[in-house]
Regions:
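Phosphodiester-processing cores and adjacent nucleic acid-binding clamps
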Residues: 1-139
C-alpha cells in the first residue's frame, strides 16, 4: 500500500527540524516509497534541492508549505498538485512575506488561498476551525 507523509519539515524549517534532504530521500528510497512530500514552515527554500534529489532517486516529489492563517492560531498545509498549483503556492507563500508579516512571521489570508486555489490542495488540522467543525459533527 502506498503511503506519503505530508507534514515533513526539513533543515529549511530552521527552528523546527534537522531533517536533511539527502538523508530523507535516501531513507524513502530504501523504504521503496513512490512519492515524498515536504511542507516546510512558511517557506519553499528546499524546493530545488528536494526536487532534484527525488528525481535522481526515482521518487515523485510533492512540494508544499505549512503556513499560518490570519486571525487563527493554527496552520494549514498547502500542497502543489501540478505546475499551476506550484506557481500559486509560491505566490501565496511570497505574499505572506511581502504583505502579511506580523512580528516577523508571514501570515496568510484565507482570501489569498481562495484566489489562487487552482492546483493547490489544502490540509486542515484538527485544531483548525474546519477540523473542529468536523469533529463536532458539523462539516
Amino acid at each position: 500500500m502506498a503511503f506519503v507523509h505530508f507534514g515533513i519539515h526539513t533543515e529549511f524549517s530552521i527552528t523546527d527540524s534537522i531533517v536533511c534532504i539527502k538523508a530523507l530521500v535516501k531513507a524513502a528510497k530504501a523504504d521503496n516509497q513512490l512519492a515524498l512530500a515536504i511542507s516546510d514552515l512558511s517557506n519553499l527554500y528546499a524546493t530545488v534541492k528536494f526536487y532534484k534529489a527525488c528525481l535522481d532517486a526515482g521518487i515523485k516529489p510533492i512540494i508544499g508549505s505549512e503556513v499560518w492563517l490570519e486571525n487563527d492560531s493554527t496552520t494549514v498545509t498547502l500542497l502543489a498538485s501540478n505546475q499551476i498549483g506550484y506557481k500559486n503556492l509560491t505566490n501565496i507563500v511570497s505574499k505572506g512575506f511581502v504583505d502579511g508579516q506580523v512580528m516577523g512571521k508571514p501570515i496568510i489570508q484565507r482570501d489569498w488561498i481562495f484566489e489562487r486555489s487552482e492546483g493547490v490542495i489544502v490540509l486542515f488540522t484538527e485544531k483548525s476551525d474546519v477540523g473542529q467543525a468536523m469533529l463536532s459533527g458539523h462539516p
